[in-house]
Swiss-Prot record:
Keyword Heme attached: no
Full protein name: Isoleucine--tRNA ligase
Domain comment quoted from the record: IleRS has two distinct active sites: one for aminoacylation and one for editing. The misactivated valine is translocated from the active site to the editing site, which sterically excludes the correctly activated isoleucine. The single editing site contains two valyl binding pockets, one specific for each substrate (Val-AMP or Val-tRNA(Ile)).
Record field: catalytic activity: tRNA(Ile) + L-isoleucine + ATP = L-isoleucyl-tRNA(Ile) + AMP + diphosphate
Enzyme Commission code: 6.1.1.5
Length: 1044
């Protein structure tokens, strides 16, 4: 029934074969079809950009997004998995700009927006075939055919509906704000887009400027790190309660006003200035000063060029006096609150000075810094120049510094719904949990209004038309609305098409669309609705699949997709858009740096899959810190270790079973009797039923970390305990009930383990299942139901007994290893000390197993350690110091002189009285530090409540037995080297050696049984292989396959 299995297998090739099987037999499609009409499990797939290839950062969420849907499908749910593509926005435009060698908004407009958008449309799906190939090779099942794209007409129309719904609720408004702005892209960014970029350490000029007070020969010393904003200076800010000094500069003979605490920074020599007056900042409020430049002197009659008080001013650096221009958010708010100045923004879309600032016209603002400094120096207004090192945000797409500037933009009013957003967050199950109140929760608490408009071209246009005469606005929520108002057929909603659509206003003007497009994050946040063309299609069905049961993405999406989903879900329906989310961390290169193609600091992921297999990579990622939203320093060796320590051991367990099942012609029945008599069978069956219970509970809670932990623990128990302890049951020649029980138990265990592992490592489990399944079973492992626990087969008491037994054996083996006593060398006695009667009974029940595993002849179970150790004691100064005072040294000395019997009395819970200088002290166990001293020929170890001792006195009989075991190991290795089959019987030849003769005389039957030798013959001519049995003992042996 079973196909022969090779011990060595190339897993990537095996996976390619399984992919062909899935494709040829349409297994994914069948898995979906068989769940039609079942309970829906809603999963949202966040849309990636297809303008680049997937990397390790994509592999983590894509693995998670495969595990959970596979599991839920096996649980009987209908899990639709539609891939999506983010096709609009800055990433696409930036790629096209580079390919067309265009620079900036003006050149794009000259090239033609219609042609530019067509180029965007052409490249936006450039790598979809590669994405499909790579994600499929990873083992992920997802529907690429029925995908959604944010540029689809139906998707864009639903986004308009979302926008209009928010607009009608009063949550959308247009206003001037100071926003982070990308000069190269010529568009503002939202505050969370800024966080997607990098903050870099940069040096900027730090200037102290002299502002002359109006009608006085006195100067304010103001500080700035943005010289380019000085031409638009409209005010000065001081701290209301900060102390200021008016000083005479003795060298320059000028009068300056400066924050008192900052005097020592500017004047290291106190003799260089004289303080003539001191006052609080409130005293300066309202004072006028002379503008540095004459560009905007006309703003004086609107409140410009005055001193204001502001809370953000400090004396931590600078002068305690700050210049105000409308290019900082706080500055802008002060001007807005205290003046009626015009919106002064003399820079163009690419942040170059316009003709309003004639001295620097055409210069990029940052490039103008030095010229502005030279100008101020020539005007004798530069007091001091320094360099200032600080962290500054860079554009996440162009890697160029952002500029903060006032700009007209459209916003979602987050302040209005902030409390609702916080309540929505309470409904979400975050994995890991700390994100709810931590990173995401705090982000919500401090969330600002969301700038959703972009001054770009390839995006979903903001659906607002304004009357050219009155400014009256009409918000459009569907194609039908636009067609009725314009009288034109709408077949494309992109900017180059609908900007041409206008209609006359009843007020005499014309309705023209506002020029901006939507932030692509608004589109991805609309994905739950737009991917279903809600509310234009299947409106009634939508409520059954919203919110999503599950989503998964990287940690950066706490300020991206997770955030926009939450905003729009709350704004539209006052509920979160998803119930459960698994958040992964970042995958970094092995040196902890960001993975970079240019630095070539990581291996191509496809090369990793082709070397180690996708299953190994999937497990490596899921087992790593990245699954807990922590960073992972990726290494190829880590994937290799997973292959070596997990994938191959699973294969070996399977290979072991198949090898002997074929030899013994074992044929499994559809029904397996699981009520076994052998303690190992009962134990492993109980363990796998417990595993089913735990896995179902943990995966239902989306706890993949715990799920993997218990799976790996079980694999270790299966391989290194059950199979290892049961080998002789499979080897023996007679097919008795015990052997049949072993086959049935291992078969049942392997098949159920494969079913449980299937969502995690879909390739290997499919391969093994195909050989294990019986005639009437499902075509693929992934068409099966997920295993459910048979409660009556769980024996917790037996599991605890076996776990305790294994713990004792592990401690004893560690003791042997620490004293270089090889496990093949038998010892006479193992002593196990525990006061716990339940543990003592377990040890008696498991005596045979313990003796075999420790290679000991007898076991002695005791309640006390007296037979193993003698005791010495030292004073516990930490405990005694506070209560003994001056007698501390004397008591400590007395404790070192306590007898073994005295210490035993203390160990048994009694007090021991020590008298010093007529003072008595009751000494208890916590007052002393115990030292155990091993008795002769004993090696002792203590761990928790267990003490183990090994009698290391080796008799000649024990010595010979140890050599026999070493001989058996060497023969087994020789069988492997000779490529003998595991069932091949052999003739074992030996030389005429005195020690070897003794070994054979004492242990002949044991050696024959273990090596499958039918006879052992002395034949010096055929015993040509020299083996070392011990450091001083070499023997010659030979083996020959028996042909009978």
């Amino acid at each position: 029934m079973f196909k022969k299995v090779e011990n060595k297998v190339h897993f990537p090739q095996l996976e390619e074969k399984i992919l062909q099987f899935w494709n040829h037999n349409k297994i994914f499609e069948k898995s979906m079809k068989q769940r039609e009409g079942c309970e829906e499990f809603t999963f949202y797939d966040g849309p990636p950009f297809a303008t680049g290839l997937p990397h390790f950062g994509h592999f983590v969420p894509n693995t998670i997004k495969d595990i959970i849907p596979r599991y839920q499908t096996m649980k009987g749910k209908n899990v639709k998995r539609y891939f999506g593509w983010d096709t609009h926005g800055l990433p696409v435009e930036y790629e096209v700009e580079k390919s067309l060698k265009l620079s900036g908004r003006y050149e794009i407009e000259q090239y033609g927006i219609d042609k530019f958008n067509e180029e965007c449309r052409n490249i936006v799906l450039r790598y979809t075939k590669e994405w499909k190939k790579i994600i499929t090779r990873l083992g992920r099942w997802v529907d690429f055919e029925n995908n959604y794209k944010t540029m689809d007409l139906t998707f864009m129309e639903s986004v308009w509906w979302v926008f209009k719904t928010l607009y009608n609720k009063g949550l959308i408004y247009e206003s001037y704000y100071v926003l982070p702005y990308s000069p190269k892209l010529a568009t503002p960014l939202s505050n969370f887009e800024v966080n997607l970029g990098e903050y870099k350490e940069i040096h900027d000029p730090s200037l102290t400027i002299k502002f002359k007070i109006k009608d006085k020969n006195e100067y304010l010393l103001a500080w700035t790190t943005t010289p380019w904003t000085l031409p638009t200076n409209l005010g000065i800010a001081v701290g209301k309660d900060i102390d200021y000094s008016k000083v005479v500069d003795q060298e320059k003979n000028e009068i300056y006003i400066i924050g008192t605490k900052r005097l020592n920074h500017y004047y290291q020599d106190e003799n260089k200035y004289v303080i003539i007056e001191q006052f609080k900042g409130e005293h300066l409020k309202g004072i006028e000063y002379e503008p540095l430049f004459d560009y905007f002197v006309n703003q004086r009659n609107k409140g410009a060029f005055k001193i204001h008080t502001a809370e953000y001013v400090t004396t931590d650096d600078g002068t305690g006096i700050v210049h105000i221009a409308p290019f900082g958010e706080e500055d802008y708010q002060i001007l807005k609150k205290n003046t009626q100045t015009d919106m002064i923004t003399p820079i163009d879309a690419e942040c170059k000075f316009t003709s309003e600032v004639k001295d620097f016209e055409g210069l990029f603002v940052k490039d103008a810094d030095n010229k502005i400094i030279e100008k101020l120096k020539s005007m004798n207004l530069l007091f001091k120049r320094e360099n200032y090192l600080h962290r500054y945000p860079f554009c996440y797409r162009t890697n160029s510094p952002l500029i903060y500037r006032p700009i007209s933009s459209w916003f979602v009013n987050i302040e209005k719904i902030k409390e609702k957003l916080i309540r929505s967050n309470e409904q979400i199950n975050w994995i890991p949990e700390h994100l709810k109140k931590g990173r995401f929760g705090k982000w919500l608490e401090n969330a600002r209004d969301w700038a959703i408009s972009r001054n770009r071209f390839w995006g979903n246009p903001i659906p607002i038309w304004k009357c050219s005469k009155t400014g009256n606005k009409i918000c459009i929520g569907s194609r039908e609305e636009l067609e009725k108002l314009s009288g034109q057929k709408i077949i494309d909603l992109h900017k180059d098409k609908i900007d041409k659509i206008t209609w006359p206003s009843k007020y005499g003007g014309t309705y023209v669309r506002t020029s901006e497009v939507l932030d692509c994050w608004f589109e991805s946040g609309s994905m739950p609705y737009a991917s279903k063309h809600y509310p234009f299609k299947d409106k009634d069905k939508f409520q059954n699949i919203f919110p999503a049961d599950f989503i998964a993405e990287g940690l950066d999406q706490t300020r991206g997709w997770f955030y926009t989903l939450t905003i729009l879900g709350t704004a539209l329906f006052e509920k979160t858009a998803f119930k459960n989310v698994i958040v992964n961390g970042l995958v970094l290169s092995s040196d902890g740096k960001k993975m970079s193609k240019s630095l070539k600091n990581y291996t191509d992921p496809i090369q990793i899959i082709n070397t180690f297999g996708a299953d190994a990579l999937r497990l490596y990622l899921i087992m790593s810190p990245v699954i807990k939203a922590d960073d992972l320093k990726y290494s190829d060796d880590g994937v290799k270790d997973v292959l070596k320590n997990i994938i191959i051991p699973i294969w070996n367990a399977y290979s072991f079973f198949i090898t002997y099942a074929i030899i013994d012609k074992f044929t499994p029945n559809n029904y397996v009797n699981l009520y076994k008599t052998n303690i190992l069978d009962k134990w492993i069956i109980s363990e796998i039923e417990s595993l089913k219970q735990i896995l179902n509970e943990e995966i239902d809670k989306y706890n993949l970390t715990k799920s993997i932990e218990v799976l790996l623990t079980f694999i270790d128990k299966l391989n290194n305990w059950y199979i290892r302890r049961s080998r002789r049951r499979f080897w023996k020649s007679e097919n008795d009930n015990d052997k049949i029980d072993a086959y049935e138990t291992l078969y049942y265990t392997l098949k159920n383990l494969m079913l449980m592992l299937a969502p995690f490592i879909p390739f290997l489990t499919e391969e093994i299942y195909q050989n294990l399944k019986t005639k009437n079973e499902k075509e693929s492992i992934h068409l099966n139901n997920y295993p459910q626990s048979i409660k009556e087969l769980i024996n917790i008491e037996l599991e605890e007994k076996m776990n305790f037994t294994r713990k004792v054996i592990t401690i004893a083996r560690a003791l042997r290893a620490s004293h270089n006593i090889k496990i093949r060398k038998p010892i006479k006695t193992i002593y196990i000390i525990t006061k716990n009667h339940k543990e003592q009974n377990t040890l008696r029940e498991m005596t045979e197993i313990i003796l075999e595993e420790i290679n000991a002849k007898e076991i002695k179970i005791k309640s006390n350690e007296e037979e193993l150790v003698t005791y010495k004691a030292k004073a516990n100064f930490k405990e005694l110091g506070s209560k003994l005072g001056t007698n501390m040294k004397s008591v400590a000395l007395a404790i070192t002189k306590l007898s073994n019997e005295d210490i035993l009395e203390i160990i048994n819970g009694n007090k021991h009285t020590i008298t010093i200088n007529n003072n008595t002290y009751d000494i208890t166990l916590k007052d002393i530090i115990l030292e155990r001293h091993e008795r002769k020929n004993l090696k002792v170890i203590n761990e928790d409540s267990i003490t183990i001792g090994l009698d290391t006195l080796i008799t000649e009989e024990l010595y010979l037995e140890g050599l026999s075991r070493e001989l058996i190991r060497k023969v087994q290795n020789l069988r492997k080297e000779s490529n003998f089959n595991v069932t091949d019987r052999i003739i074992l030849y030996t030389n005429n050696d005195e020690i070897l003769t003794k070994i054979i005389n004492n242990f002949e039957n044991y050696i024959k049984t273990e090596t499958l030798a039918i006879t052992i013959e002395i034949n010096n001519k055929k015993a040509l292989t020299t083996l070392e049995l011990d450091e001083e003992i070499s023997v010659n042996i030979g083996i020959e396959k028996c042909l009978n």
